[in-house]
Amino acid sequence: MMEIAYQPRIDSEIESLVERINPPRVCVDNDSDPECTLIKVDSANKYGILLDMVQVLADLDLVISKCYISSDGEWFMDVFHVTDQLGNKLTDRSLILYIQQAICSSRTGGITKEMQSNLKREVQQRHVSTEHTAFEITGINRPGLLSEISAVLSDIGCHVTAAVAWTHHERAAMVIYLEDGFNGGPIIDPIRKAQVKDHLDTVMEAHHIVGDVSHVVVRVVEAKGVPVGWAHTERRLHELMYGEGDYENCFDCDCFGDRCDALWRGRCERIHVTIEACNGYSMVNVKCRDRPKLLFDTVCALKELQFVVFHAVAGAKGSTAEQEYFIRKKNGGTLETEGQRERLRHCLVAAISRRASQGLKLEIRTENKMGLLSDVTRVVRENGLSITRAEMCTQGEIAVGSFYVTDVNGGETGPSEVEAVVRELGGAVVSAVKGVGMMPRRIGSTSDSVEQDKAKSSIGRMFWSKLERLSTSIRSL
């Protein structure tokens, strides 16, 4: 029998009116917990609102140690336990005000320059800039690819003002922001933009593999008004990687099967994803090594697949993160087939793995100049190293960036190669540390991992028992 589902059609103007009448209420609480700041958000529910909130905190490089999320379908209530990167509570009044304004404005047009100017610290720009032209590049990864791309851009007079590059499962995705190296400002001339695209196409097709399709997409940002194709850079990278199918053959660890003992399960830091039906929802459990922005990446994957998070809880025990989501499809359905569940598992594993810190992390800080990215990546390539992930941006006269490097086969870098890179780049390198993907945190006492495994129960079911008390406390804000 065919199942027919009816959904009410809500006019966008009415939906906007509801948001204006009931804007998000954000409370920053430094009294309830001695070790972290509680950010409590109470707002009208809207598809994608959870990702918008997590994005604000992630862009500030705040550490989310725990979070509780609940929705009754029309109203959304969240509590985030956060600290700064050093494990301290948030006490800066300008930062607290910025968080309150940014979460509210995320539903009404985004963060303004005035809001950023009032914040007494730098916020890394993770959105399309209205002063530059953005190029998106995806395709097969190979050693030296970023070096080739940046060299071509330098040769044709394009100044890279910011760039983010990810590699995963032999795929590469990049978002590069350019300005005219001769005249400054965005590249406006259509002929000039076409020229840049042609050169990038040539680089990507230089090692073309039969059956593969590489893409170079120009996304233009207008100098005035709302940018065309406005997007958050890291969200866009997730979308690009997903579009490239990097999630195929991404398998989670199966060490929870009968073949593995409790000791191994307790120590395993690989990615585990389990999905089961629970009270009209699909319950998704994620367990993996903790790292910065893990919550952002998993929520981003769920949003990309058009799932709605109704309830969730996330936290960490030592170096292990555990997350549990109660989700439905955007159309109200749940995951009914094993094929649907397997696809979600693959996509979550891919989203978590894309940002995994592979190799040695080189942090640079130097003078902003034409061809800087080309110079740095050339030195890395000429010393037999490969870049697995990179992020660079300019702040006035200064350029800062981080580059994760391995040998050409993806193995650990040798000390001689690293010394050569540091020597050639000179004072530009401010640190070189092994990227272990761990977030700084104060370590509290935890029970033995085996005992934790024996006592393992659904953290979501524990959450249900606290949900009524949580809802009451938030509504009293």
UniProtKB/Swiss-Prot annotation:
The keyword Ubl conjugation does not apply. Signal peptide: none annotated. Residues 38-124, 134-214, 283-358, 361-441 form the ACT domain. Keywords: Nucleus, Repeat. It is found in: Nucleus. A motif (Bipartite nuclear localization signal) lies at residues 329-345. Expressed in flowers and siliques. Gene3D superfamilies: 3.30.70.260. The keyword Zinc does not apply. This is ACT domain-containing protein ACR1. The gene is ACR1.
